[in-house]
């Protein structure tokens, strides 16, 4: 009888831990301090950064940030001062995108079905509901709790959803500063590459390498010519 009660206690603890784990992102978002912004100022912000929804997928060579919930995967990209967020379903099928102008860093997260877009320089968060009908802008108080939330959930390159671990990887580009893959590891430790932009990054690295090599050759040639002239 005693063993039966112990087993029930273990089962109860297991389910409680699962509930806490699955709601971690949502509850942590509630801990940060935000203030609503008026309709006029919201409109001005959305207009000034040219925030808009797009229906064509734009492919990039590296992933800047990502977010996961039960039904969606969001991938964030930098294209100079233009930022893009591609939204995919849980089978990695493209659905739609958002794009906007921003000169600083940005990050993304989900609060349940709501997409949260953080503009770090401006200290604001833009939230878009699942139906894509409501866009809300709030100012965020910059404090220790906010920084901890950013580090743990928004900036993190490793995230957990429904006992599955997701992380950004450089793939086989060991010395690359860019993340080219989003990898999923399930509860049985089976690994699956969901998105892979490594081939696109090879082209970029080749172009950059060629430019650097050309610059070094020109520099060495100038040094050699200068030494020869002095002789």
For each feature predicted by the language model, list its residue ranges.
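N-terminal secretory signal peptides that target proteins for export/translocation
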Residues: 1-2
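Eukaryotic scaffold repeat domains enriched in small/polar residues
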Residues: 7-10, 14-231
């Amino acid at each position: 009888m005693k063993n039966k009660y112990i087993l029930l206690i273990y089962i109860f603890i297991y389910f409680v831990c699962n509930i806490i784990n699955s709601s971690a992102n949502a509850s942590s978002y509630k801990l940060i301090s935000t203030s609503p912004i008026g309709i006029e100022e919201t409109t001005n912000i959305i207009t000034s950064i040219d925030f808009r929804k797009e229906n064509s997928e734009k492919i990039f060579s590296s992933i800047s940030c990502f977010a996961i919930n039960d039904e969606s995967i969001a991938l964030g990209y930098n294209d100079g001062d233009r930022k893009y967020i591609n939204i995919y379903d849980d089978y990695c099928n493209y659905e739609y995108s958002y794009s906007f102008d921003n000169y600083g860093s940005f990050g993304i997260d989900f609060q349940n079905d709501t997409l949260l877009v953080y503009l770090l320089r401006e200290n604001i968060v833009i939230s878009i509901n699942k139906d894509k009908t409501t866009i809300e802008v709030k100012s965020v108080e910059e404090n220790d709790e906010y920084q901890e939330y950013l580090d743990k959930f928004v900036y993190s390159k490793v995230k957990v959803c429904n006992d599955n671990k997701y992380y950004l990887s450089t793939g086989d580009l060991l010395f690359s500063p860019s993340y080219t893959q989003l990898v999923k590891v399930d509860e049985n430790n089976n690994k699956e590459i969901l998105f892979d932009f490594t081939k696109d990054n090879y082209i970029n690295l080749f172009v950059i390498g060629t430019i650097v090599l050309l610059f070094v050759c020109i520099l060495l040639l100038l040094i050699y010519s200068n030494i020869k002239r002095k002789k």
